[in-house]
Regions:
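Intrinsic disorder at enzyme termini
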Residues: 5-29, 33, 388, 414-478
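Generic, well-ordered alpha-helical scaffold segments in large soluble proteins
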Residues: 74, 78, 82, 98-102, ...
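The feature marks the mature, well-folded catalytic cores of soluble enzymes
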Residues: 1-309
């Protein structure tokens, strides 16, 4: 289940309250987040080296995005030259239709999947199931949440919200012959045995893409479990799906980005596996698919690209570091957001995918502490972009800016009238002094609760005397 039907960004507040009231979930996230932050801290022990790595990664992503249309054309040409068939999808529906057509052409009844956030974005599993095609997640975390009828809560560790006992309970309920245990090695072996035969039976393997190299027409896949390599080599057909922003100019761009990604995500110098796919199996090769397809998805990315400020959201390399350091995400987890991409990065990506009408609550679910921007390996100014999206949610597009989907959806007529009234009073001194004087005299009648903000804070009251009155009094006394 990957369509997030259980959760919705429109229900962010009740979902967040439910998460905060769940002590097991809070404890699971506390331990996991502490671990990931410590691993990243150790990986970047030298501040000068950290700055150099982040500077290099930022420069590469900005350079590649500045040439995005040209690089996409170059990628398509070189992929086709290598025997990789390239497909373009504007929407999730188009992406699913393309892959469904490939599957039906080859009589595929089961698909084994590697880690792919874009497949979650398009609701791939749900759509294939509607047409009688079984999809099985092979990433261990994704496999666990799929067995449980759950959804991922983190972009690199999908089952991070579950502890060992919960994983054991999931296996006991879904896998025959499993003996309940909380031994991590035993749990991993159980998952491995369940998945092994699926690779051989599957008619298609689906994967994501970490870096698509325009210069060579190659697809790079970063992983730790080996399931990605199995998905891309054992089935006769391999389909890779990715967003259009994942393209890089040349192979030499990959190592700096790879280093920034692994250190920021899991604190590793390198991952266990790094796969470079440059076409289907050739004559004389012993393994590999007969066909390789690449699906390039837009789904709102072009609109972000056309805005020079919002284009920075496309720099993301999906490391998850911003989530691990966010005081909101680390307390409520990923499900509360109700979006495929949770946490700080999800707040600035989701409006392009879903529109501001359904995501306006997310952009305000931030203290703007800046922790996300401080750890982002490609230096995305997430706090600045959140403030921009807050404005977009409540106001019309500024001159020269293309309106976003759902522009102004969070506009409040009462709030607008209140601000207009304040602006009028503030520009008319006599009216302003009279209003503040009345407010000071009536301060005892102020209600204790003024909306959600005062549910956990004391409502501020007007001062007994205004600043002007205090200054006049002091002047008289002197």
């Amino acid at each position: 289940m990957s369509d997030h039907a259980k959760y919705s960004p429109r229900r962010f507040h009740p979902q967040a309250e439910a998460a905060l009231a769940d002590p097991v979930l809070r404890q699971n996230f506390r331990g996991a987040m502490d671990y990931l932050r410590a691993k990243r801290r150790d990986a970047f022990a030298d501040p000068a080296e950290e700055a150099a790595v982040r500077d290099a990664a930022e420069q590469i992503r900005q350079r590649c995005l500045s040439r995005l249309p040209d690089l996409l054309e170059q990628l398509e040409a070189n992929c086709e030259r290598n025997g990789i068939r390239v497909h373009w999808a504007q929407t999730p529906a188009e992406a699913n239709a393309i892959i469904l057509g490939i599957a039906q052409q080859h009589g595929v009844s089961s698909i084994v999947k590697g880690k792919s956030m874009v497949s979650e974005e398009v609701g791939f599993n749900h759509e294939m199931a509607r047409h009688g095609i079984r999809c099985l997640e092979s990433d261990m975390g994704e496999f666990i949440v799929q067995l449980d009828g759950d959804t991922p809560s983190h972009i690199i560790m999908p089952a991070i919200h579950k502890n060992k006992q919960e994983v054991s309970d999931t296996f006991a309920s879904n896998l025959e012959g499993f003996t309940p245990t909380t031994d991590v090695d035993a749990l991993i072996q159980t998952g491995r045995r369940a998945l092994r035969e699926e690779f051989r039976r599957a008619g298609m393997g689906l994967s994501g893409v970490n870096f698509a190299v325009a210069e060579t027409g190659s697809l790079c896949l970063v992983e730790n479990e080996g399931n990605g390599r199995m998905c891309t080599t054992v089935p006769k057909v391999h389909v890779a799906i990715t967003g259009i922003e994942k393209v890089v100019e040349c192979l030499s761009d990959v190592p700096p980005l790879y280093s920034a990604l692994t250190r920021s995500a899991t604190g590793q110098a390198i991952t266990t596996y790094f796969n470079v796919i440059s076409g289907p199996r050739r004559a004389g090769e012993l393994d590999g698919p007969d066909e390789v397809h690449l699906v390039l998805l837009d789904n709102g990315r072009s609109q972000a690209y056309r805005d020079e400020e919002l284009r920075k959201t496309l720099q993301c390399i999906r490391c998850g570091a911003c989530m691990n350091h966010c005081p909101v995400y680390t307390r409520i987890g990923g499900h509360a957001y109700g979006t495929i991409y949770p946490g700080p990065i999800g707040k600035i990506i989701s409006p392009h995918l879903l529109g501001l009408e359904s995501t306006s609550d997310l952009v305000t679910a931030s203290s703007l502490c800046g922790a996300c921007g401080e750890v982002c390996p490609v230096r995305i100014p997430i706090p600045d972009l959140l403030q921009r999206l807050r404005r977009e949610a409540k106001h019309d597009a500024q001159p020269g800016h293309e309106p976003l989907a759902g522009q102004g959806a969070a506009r409040s007529r009462l709030e607008t009238l209140a601000m207009q009234g304040f602006a009028f009073a503030a520009t008319h001194p006599r009216l302003y002094h009279a209003a503040t004087g009345v407010a000071g005299r009536l301060r005892g009648l102020m209600p204790k609760h003024l909306g959600p903000w005062t549910q956990c804070r004391e409502a501020p009251k007007p001062a007994p005397q205004s600043l002007h009155a205090l200054l006049r009094q002091k002047k008289k006394e002197s």
